[in-house]
UniProtKB/Swiss-Prot annotation:
Transmembrane segments: none annotated. Required for the formation of N(7)-methylguanine at position 46 (m7G46) in tRNA. In the complex, it is required to stabilize and induce conformational changes of the catalytic subunit. The lineage of its organism: Eukaryota, Fungi, Dikarya, Ascomycota, Saccharomycotina. It is found in: Nucleus. It comes from the Eukaryota. HAMAP family: TRM82. This is tRNA (guanine-N(7)-)-methyltransferase non-catalytic subunit TRM82. GO terms for biological process: tRNA (guanine-N7)-methylation. Forms a heterodimer with the catalytic subunit TRM8. GO terms for cellular component: cytosol; nucleus; tRNA methyltransferase complex. Belongs to the WD repeat TRM82 family.
């Protein structure tokens, strides 16, 4: 059976769907697909055993991957083939990738951010790499932001300790400011534009979305995801206690029967699509069989909850299509929706043709679902008392 895609994303120009699947045996594949047809434009089977866990696209048909062996690999698409430009060994395992100008910007689990030039120059020794900036907590994401008036570049970083930091670029040791509001880890940050203004939406361990005017360091509004995902929660989401086993046993004896369990949720992915009257934010809460769509103008309102046939692993918006990778058996691992009049609706024609082609093109096969790679790690960022989970 086919292994689900762990990574789906759009090319920078919005013309290609990029999909990656990696099995626990470290087989990996990259597919560059035409989203309107499902045809494979280019396929890259990674020659050495490697597990790709992050992927980012850049300008000029550049593709950047990070793997669990601490490598950054930079490819360029030329004549419908991926050519490796560079592979750089990093000091620590990576936790996010962005691009700015002709540089890859990467963050790691130690809390540092590095700049890797997108060129064919030889890689340097990892010991010689110098961080652009650092947090005192493991980083979870980095995005490069451009402010138009006055024109200036910034790096926005998030970490396990509730921080979102805005730093100048390239002098990233100069901190512009922080975005305060989170009380749990921040797992996702996403830039979007509305009315020609750059905005940021973030999500993490509170189960909320936070909307920011990041340049002015102002929290615009919050949106609570829990009411829209609660019916899709299960044992995975039940809040874990930081108490000792003895304390838990005493608590169980004192509890009244039929008390509803308390849940804790984490945001796994955020993306956006423009509508006629605002921006629609699509959010995946980890290990749920739904996607929550929020309509944002100057406030955030629930627009839609998309019910899925199985838990979503990831998703991508390419043009007006929404591609969702599912943690499912029987090769039903991809479903497609189209965006029409502010709603995502089933794209039956695409499902019967495009989705089937993409699934068949996936070269990673496993014996059964028990051989799937682990998909759900966001909740491991959560603190338990004075410790992390």
């Amino acid at each position: 059976m086919k292994h689900p895609f762990q990574i789906l994303t759009s090319s920078t120009d919005g013309k290609l769907l990029i999909a990656s699947a990696s099995s626990p045996s470290k087989e990996s594949s990259l597919l560059l697909l035409l989203p309107e047809l499902g045809d494979v434009l280019c396929q890259q089977n990674v020659p050495q055993p490697i597990y790709i866990n992050y992927l980012e696209t850049g300008p000029d048909k550049v593709l950047i991957t990070a793997d669990v062996d601490k490598n950054i690999t930079i490819y360029k698409l030329e004549n419908n083939e991926l050519h490796q430009l560079k592979q750089q060994q990093m000091p620590k395992r990576l936790s996010g990738i962005s691009t700015l100008n002709n540089d890859a910007i990467v963050c790691d689990s130690l809390g540092d951010v590095y700049q890797i030039t997108i060129d064919t120059q030889p890689a340097v020794k990892k010991e010689d790499l110098k961080p652009l900036l650092g947090h005192t907590s493991p980083l979870t994401a980095v995005v490069a932001a451009q402010y138009k008036n006055p024109p200036k570049s910034f790096l926005i970083t998030s970490d396990r300790d509730e921080h979102i930091r805005v730093s100048n670029y390239p002098k990233s040791y100069v901190i512009k400011g922080f975005l305060y509001g989170h009380t749990q880890f921040v797992s996702q940050i996403h830039l979007f534009e509305i009315c020609k203004e750059s905005r940021l939406v973030s999500g993490g361990g509170e189960g909320k979305l936070f909307f920011w005017d990041w340049f002015r360091e102002v929290l615009i509004t919050e949106f609570d995801l829990m009411p829209y995902v609660e019916e899709y929660l299960h044992e995975f989401h039940i809040k874990k206690s930081s108490k000792t086993k003895e304390e838990q046993d005493v608590q169980k004896e004192q509890e009244v029967e039929n008390i509803q369990p308390k849940y804790e949720i984490g945001v796994q992915k955020i993306d956006s699509i423009e509508g006629e009257d605002g921006v629609f934010i699509v959010t995946l809460v980890e290990n749920t069989s739904c996607l929550v769509v929020v309509h944002f103008t100057d406030e955030a309102k629930h627009a839609q909850t998309i019910q899925l046939a199985a838990p979503a692993v990831t998703f991508a918006i390419v043009g007006n299509k929404l591609f969702v990778s599912l943690d499912a058996e029987n090769d039903n691992i991809l479903t497609i929706y189209k965006f029409v009049d502010g709603q995502f609706v089933n794209d039956d024609e695409a499902q019967s043709s495009i989705a089937e082609r993409i699934i068949l093109a996936n070269p990673i096969n496993v014996e059964d679902k028990s051989k799937f790679a682990p998909f759900y790690s966001i909740n491991q960022l959560r603190k338990r008392g004075n410790n992390y989970s």
